[in-house]
Structures are given as C-alpha cells and as structure tokens.
C-alpha cells in the first residue's frame, strides 16, 4: 500500500473513534443532567430515575464501543 492510503486509514480511524467519544460524552452529560434535574424536582422518584439513567447511559456508551470496533476494522483490514 502507498503511504497516503496508510495515512488516510489512520486518519479515518482516529476521526471515527474521536467523534464517537465526543458524541457519547455530550449525550451522557445531557442524560445525567436531566436525571439530576428530575431528582431535584421529585426526590421520591429518584430510584426509578436512577435505574432508567443507568440503562440510558449504557445504551449511549454502546455507540463508542462500536465505533472503536469499526476503527480497528479500518486499521487492520
């Protein structure tokens, strides 16, 4: 392979992983802030909100994990 195609592979992998991490960080921040807002408004529903928040954060975190898998596929295939 040429030098440029190898360089573009590394660039594409880093952009994919970086943007996914940025989007997940923003999404997690939004979910957690809104959950804390809801807990402050209705403290009696804190347990339900916390459980729902953990499920949401887990689903959001699945996106960067998949992006890292795609980045590795770009690099090694």
UniProtKB/Swiss-Prot annotation:
It holds the Pfam family ATP-synt_C. Keywords: ATP synthesis, Cell membrane, CF(0), Hydrogen ion transport, Ion transport, Lipid-binding, Membrane, Transmembrane, Transmembrane helix, Transport. The record marks 61 as: Reversibly protonated during proton transport. It is a multi-pass membrane protein. The keyword Glycoprotein does not apply. One of its GO terms (cellular component) is plasma membrane. The chain crosses the membrane at residues 7-27, 57-77. Its main location: membrane. Signal peptide: none annotated. SUPFAM superfamilies: F1F0 ATP synthase subunit C (SSF81333). InterPro entries: ATP_synth_csu_bac/chlpt (IPR005953), ATP_synth_F0_csu (IPR000454), ATP_synth_F0_csu_DDCD_BS (IPR020537), ATP_synth_F0_csu_sf (IPR038662), ATPase_proteolipid_c-like_dom (IPR002379), F/V-ATP_Csub_sf (IPR035921). It comes from the Bacteria. GO terms for molecular function: lipid binding; proton-transporting ATP synthase activity, rotational mechanism. It is found in: Cell membrane. The keyword Magnesium does not apply. Belongs to the ATPase C chain family. F(1)F(0) ATP synthase produces ATP from ADP in the presence of a proton or sodium gradient. F-type ATPases consist of two structural domains, F(1) containing the extramembraneous catalytic core and F(0) containing the membrane proton channel, linked together by a central stalk and a peripheral stalk. During catalysis, ATP synthesis in the catalytic domain of F(1) is coupled via a rotary mechanism of the central stalk subunits to proton translocation. Key component of the F(0) channel; it plays a direct role in translocation across the membrane. A homomeric c-ring of between 10-14 subunits forms the central stalk rotor element with the F(1) delta and epsilon subunits. HAMAP family: ATP_synth_c_bact. F-type ATPases have 2 components, F(1) - the catalytic core - and F(0) - the membrane proton channel. F(1) has five subunits: alpha(3), beta(3), gamma(1), delta(1), epsilon(1). F(0) has three main subunits: a(1), b(2) and c(10-14). The alpha and beta chains form an alternating ring which encloses part of the gamma chain. F(1) is attached to F(0) by a central stalk formed by the gamma and epsilon chains, while a peripheral stalk is formed by the delta and b chains. This is ATP synthase subunit c. It comes from Lactobacillus helveticus (strain DPC 4571).
